[in-house]
Amino acid sequence: MSNSEFKSLGCSKWLVEALNAMKIVQPTAIQKACIPEILKGRDCIGGANTGSGKTIAFAAPMLTKWSEDPQGMFGIVLTPTRELAMQIAEQFTAFGSAMNIRVAIVVGGESIVQQAIELQKRPHFIIATPGRLAHHVLNSGEDTIGGLKRVKFLVLDEADILLTETFSKDLATCVSILPPKNKRQNLLFTATMTDQVKALSDAPQTEGKPPVFTFEVESVDNVAIPKTLETTYLLVPEHVKESYLYQILTSEKYVKSSCIIFVNRTVTAEILRRTLKSLDVRVTSLHSQMPQQERTNSVQRFRAQAARVLIATDVASRGLDIPIVELVVNYDIPGNPDTFIHRAGRTARAGRHGESLCFVTEKDIQRVEAIEERINKKMEEFTDVGDTAVIRKSLTKVTAAKRESLMAMDKEGFGERRKLQKRKNESKEKTHRRT
């Protein structure tokens, strides 16, 4: 296959050349199916595993349509996390660089005033998180948000998350400023086809529009994870999980490996980051309590391999494109099996081999069984590191490092900033209701 196949899908010549320059020459299944239908003007619901090229599946037809009349605000992409928004914006900018495309990023943690200025310049594409865009809709003037009333495309990336109650209020606010649904194309993409997403595909046809195109890439043998992914578990006592983690990361097999450690709580991420750093592991972290610039820097450090270990909450489980991750550790087991799939999807990408290791305590047995049922695969027991090695080599110094980390966090008031911000938000909500 050659880049002419993207041309046969209907992509503009300039875009085909841009993709070719980036060594993107063979369309994936989701791209082959969705690009032509979107170019026909159909709404689209696309489902495919993580790493399957969903961004190009919606970006390519949007850019092709935009280039036919490159004026004003043309499309909005909503996504649940800041990091995903920045990554999508990078891709749009790269694909459209030859056409002087203007892309605005509208996410939390950045200057609201600067974002308003960018929106006033009428960027061609807006990549946003729902909360921050909703803020502009409610509070910024007509000169800032007026262009949103004429957009041609709305994309919900990671639609299964955006359609949950967490985002419902902000999402409704964002949509309220847009043209009616029969005057715009609506594209939903997800790695998990939830009931909410499927319900939209079964909704009555919008008058004056062709029927919604729905496409889901079927998983081989009903397994929702790559065939090149090795899944293992390790039974670990809760109180010594840090010691086991350190022993694995510094073992001969993994001492040079690129690794993401997933945890369920921000405080756990911070404890592990500090503990491992004091033990001379090149580590960084990514969680919601970090200022946006720190979050951005952290992802960049990990991508550049300045840090080989990333400690993350599920902020990093969706869509982040980090080329080579050799090991994913579920330090905490997620309650939702689909979350495990998204975490595991950070490794074994593009046909490469990868490993996923679950730390399993007594309370996690049912969660692991639910994951195995979901992926239709039994995990193998991890045997590379045993109890004796942990006790002999790691336990004492890791325990001391953790104690120092906890003392430092207590002294710095870690978590107080979040409580303060929560009180501020609650105060704003009360003021908003009164007005």
UniProtKB/Swiss-Prot annotation:
PANTHER family: ATP-DEPENDENT RNA HELICASE (PTHR47959:SF24), ATP-DEPENDENT RNA HELICASE RHLE-RELATED (PTHR47959)
Biased composition (Basic and acidic residues): 409-429
Top-level taxon in the UniProt lineage: Eukaryota
SUPFAM superfamilies: P-loop containing nucleoside triphosphate hydrolases
Record-linked SMART domains: DEXDc (SM00487), HELICc (SM00490)
Segments carrying motif Q motif: 4-32
Domain notes: The Q motif is unique to and characteristic of the DEAD box family of RNA helicases and controls ATP binding and hydrolysis.
A Pfam family matched in the record: DEAD
Signal peptide: none
Principal subcellular localization: nucleus
UniProt entry keywords in alphabetical sequence: ATP-binding, Helicase, Hydrolase, Nucleotide-binding, Nucleus, Ribosome biogenesis, RNA-binding, rRNA processing
Gene3D superfamilies, sorted: P-loop containing nucleotide triphosphate hydrolases
Region feature Disordered, mapped onto this chain: 409-435
Helicase ATP-binding domain span: 35-211
GO biological process: rRNA processing
Sample GO molecular function, one term: RNA helicase activity
Physiological role: ATP-binding RNA helicase involved in 40S ribosomal subunit biogenesis and is required for the normal formation of 18S rRNAs through pre-rRNA processing at A0, A1 and A2 sites. Required for vegetative growth.
Catalytic activity line of the entry: ATP + H2O = ADP + phosphate + H(+)
The protein, known as: ATP-dependent RNA helicase DBP8
Motif (DEAD box): 157-160
Family that this chain belongs to: Belongs to the DEAD box helicase family. DDX49/DBP8 subfamily.
CDD domains, A to Z: DEADc_DDX49, SF2_C_DEAD
Residue ranges annotated for the Helicase C-terminal domain, each copy included: 244-391
